[in-house]
């Protein structure tokens, strides 16, 4: 029997909606990253993007354990000398709640062109409303 490898043109992708309200950041991000890669499917192939589309709602209600809400730092750099910026979890969740989940998931995906394609299938929204009702996403319990 020959080994099966998925072809990019035959991959069937589904849309799922995940409610992040009350979920722990890391546990939610690992499951999302796994589904974006397609590792939950029997036809998973490492060099082919077999993952599904994931829509995350209520990103502003995500939680972290312990003192991470004040201690967890996010860093960015402008590229200029002395241009490092830092912001903690509390301030980032108030300023841009989508970025918290996006950053966590992006760090769990491959750092190559295939990983960037997988990351583009992630849609994160701060509130409960999202513009993807036409795709008829199924609810995913995590």
Curated annotation (Swiss-Prot):
InterPro entries: Ribosomal_uL13, Ribosomal_uL13_bac-type, Ribosomal_uL13_CS, Ribosomal_uL13_sf. It comes from the Bacteria. GO terms for cellular component: cytosolic large ribosomal subunit. Keywords: Ribonucleoprotein, Ribosomal protein. Part of the 50S ribosomal subunit. HAMAP family: Ribosomal_uL13. This is Large ribosomal subunit protein uL13. It comes from Pseudomonas putida (strain W619). The lineage of its organism: Bacteria, Pseudomonadati, Pseudomonadota, Gammaproteobacteria, Pseudomonadales. The gene is rplM.
């Amino acid at each position: 029997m020959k080994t099966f490898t998925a072809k990019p043109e035959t991959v069937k992708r589904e849309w799922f909606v995940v409610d992040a309200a009350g979920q722990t950041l890391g546990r939610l991000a690992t499951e999302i990253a796994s589904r974006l890669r397609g590792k939950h499917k029997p036809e998973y192939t490492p060099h082919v993007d077999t993952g599904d589309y994931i829509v995350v709602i209520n990103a502003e209600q995500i939680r972290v354990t312990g003192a991470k809400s004040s201690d967890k730092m996010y860093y960015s750099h402008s590229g200029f000398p002395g241009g490092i910026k830092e912001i903690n979890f509390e301030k980032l969740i108030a300023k841009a709640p989508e970025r918290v989940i996006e950053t966590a998931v992006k760090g769990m995906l491959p750092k190559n062109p295939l990983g960037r394609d997988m990351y583009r299938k992630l849609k994160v929204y701060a509130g409960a409303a999202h513009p993807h009702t036409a795709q008829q996403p199924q609810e995913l319990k995590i």
